Amino acid sequence: MTQPQMAPICLVENHNEQLSVNQEAIEILDKISQPVVVVAIVGWSHTGKSYLMNCLAGQNHVSGTLPTSQRFPSGLHRAVSDQGHLDVVHAPPHQARALVLLDTEGLGDVEKGDPKNDLWIFALSVLLSSTFVYNSMNTINHQALEQLHYVTELTELIRAKSSPNPHGIKNSTEFVSFFPDFVWTVRDFMLELKLNGEDITSDEYLENALKLIPGNNPRIQASNSARECIRRFFPNRKCFVFEWPTHDIELIKQLETISEDQLDPTFKESAMAFASYIFTYAKIKTLREGIKVTGNGLGTLVTTYVDAINSGAVPCLDDAVTTLAQRENSVAVQKAASHYSEQMAQRLSLPTDTIQELLDVHAACEKEAMAVFMEHSFKDENQQFLKKLVELLREKNGLFLLKNEEASDKYCQEELDRLSKDLMDNISTFSVPGGHRLYMDMREKIEHDYWQVPRKGVKASEVFQNFLQSQAIIESSILQADTALTAGQKAIAEKHTKKEAAEKEQDLLRQKQKEHQEYMEAQEKRNKENLEQLRRKLEQEREQLIKDHNMMLEKLTKEQKTFREEGYKTQAEELRREIHQLGHNIKEMKQNGDSLVESILRSWFSFISPPSESEKAISSVLSLLRKKDRL
């Protein structure tokens, strides 16, 4: 069943030469927890780019159906579509990813007034998208490339790193690492796809159009500058050409109202190919080091970038990623902690029979919670959020240990009260000759029955020990009043009682020692498992970083080779230097990666190893036990 359309919502608008983010759009993005594929469509006014947006949004109409600048303030518009349908809808929770469409108001619109508006909207589209679609008319020629002068200003509008390059060099590798794929769509294409009399594909047409043209003419230099920037910043390129939607002049005048079957079949075929490519190959928005952006993460990015622009700064990827990491890692801590609490509550039946039973469940739930955090966190500098999680899990584990003790204490006390009720109700009947033996028989039966009660928990011995201590004065009174016993027999009985009490106290202390040993062994095992989880994550991040750098190296090497073959030695040499530096960085990552990981792991182990206050308290119990053993 087709879901109802969701109207486009303005994401970024320009009021009085000041960009602002629409909070309604941010609230919608915040609800999208899946990774997002972000497609931005940019082009000059009245070039038909809205039709492309409609193709992706599932509207079978031609340009004009999306709001124009007369109806919406200038800026980006967003719509969300799931990957399974072309209807513009909220992304369902079960979808693995969501599609976010960013439609810009037309570039060069004189009604917008602010000349910088186009520059910033162009830059934001590049920063936010994973696929950047540039739409133009007729052909890719000098004029079309001159109109794309915005791409030559990206290095002035965007920074990759918080600290500038120490040599002041604008390194294209910094941008290649996070720039989107580039798709050029040409509407009302007027040429045949031929080169030197041979048929060529639209992609080959684009690559030929991006070849540098010899000459010092200012127009040639301007178009060459755009060509070079596209080739260096956007190594993944694709092109689609669209012939006229219809050759009927009267129908062209009514493009907004004609039906789909009145469109030229070749035009419809191109539109379907474009939409199919986007839905099949458009990638999830990914930042450096393989960080996948979710809907709520996209909202954080756009807010951070717009805040930077409004403050007079240049949007910086590193700063945005840091802001995003702070938010996402904080959420990851809460997700992991909630998972731990939910799973502990589901799997535990308090009181547990032994402390080991609780520790086993805790270990399993903690391991899962750590995995949840590792999955949803990134760039956790100095493991500050992981430390918060560990402290939170320790606190929660302590609460479960306390609840377990309280449940055991309550249950044991209730059972002991039930079993000893007859004894306590008839205590006066033992003040007779031979009463001490009768009292001891009944108490021994209580003890026997008590230890037959299942799942008393960790407080079973302590509760019974307290019961015996509460009976000590009563037993002594009954013993002294028993005229059937001689003074010597009473002394022997009293000595036996004290010895038995001392032995039970020793048993209780040994039990606490055993529980402490189990706790410490379980903690050590968990620490090793947590350390291994952290090691895997650090190594995966390093491998991803090396993989990303190798991909950049491959793309830049290919582009450098092309420049060299075309005879452009200056551009080839610039890329050679960048390739050399990138190769050096990869070599350093491989050589120093292990030592860096080990350094982080050592620091982490020193954090998780120190004994807690509760462990110190247990140590004092051990000290007391050793003293008693020496007596």
UniProtKB/Swiss-Prot annotation:
Quaternary organization: Heterodimer with other family members, including GBP1, GBP2 and GBP5. Dimerization regulates subcellular location. Interacts with IRF7; preventing interaction between TRAF6 and IRF7, resulting in impaired TRAF6-mediated IRF7 ubiquitination.
Parts forming coiled coils: 492-592
Record-stated family: Belongs to the TRAFAC class dynamin-like GTPase superfamily. GB1/RHD3 GTPase family. GB1 subfamily.
Induction text: Up-regulated in response to Sendai virus (SeV) infection.
Protein name, entry field: Guanylate-binding protein 4
The keyword Thylakoid appears for this protein: no
PROSITE patterns noted in UniProt: G_GB1_RHD3
Gene Ontology process terms (BP): cellular response to type II interferon; negative regulation of interferon-alpha production; negative regulation of protein import into nucleus; negative regulation of protein ubiquitination; negative regulation of transcription by RNA polymerase II; regulation of defense response to virus
Organism: Mus musculus (Mouse)
Keyword terms of this UniProt record: Coiled coil, Cytoplasm, Golgi apparatus, GTP-binding, Hydrolase, Immunity, Innate immunity, Membrane, Nucleotide-binding, Nucleus
Domain GB1/RHD3-type G, first and last residues per copy: 33-283
Function: Interferon (IFN)-inducible GTPase that plays important roles in innate immunity against a diverse range of bacterial, viral and protozoan pathogens. Negatively regulates the antiviral response by inhibiting activation of IRF7 transcription factor.
Catalysis performed (reactions): GTP + H2O = GDP + phosphate + H(+)
One GO cellular component term: Golgi membrane
Binding locations of GTP: G43, W44, S45, H46, T47, G48, K49, S50, D103, T104, E105, G106, L107
Gene3D superfamilies registered for this protein in UniProt: Guanylate-binding protein, C-terminal domain, P-loop containing nucleotide triphosphate hydrolases
Annotated compartments: Golgi apparatus membrane; Cytoplasm; Nucleus; Cytoplasm, Perinuclear region
Principal EC category: hydrolase
InterPro entries: G_GB1_RHD3_dom (IPR030386), GBP_C (IPR037684), Guanylate-bd/ATL_C (IPR003191), Guanylate-bd_C_sf (IPR036543), Guanylate-bd_N (IPR015894), P-loop_NTPase (IPR027417)
GO molecular function, one term: GTPase activity
Tissue: Mainly expressed in organs of the immune system, such as spleen and lymph nodes.
EC numbers: 3.6.5.-
PANTHER family assigned: GUANYLATE BINDING PROTEIN (PTHR10751)
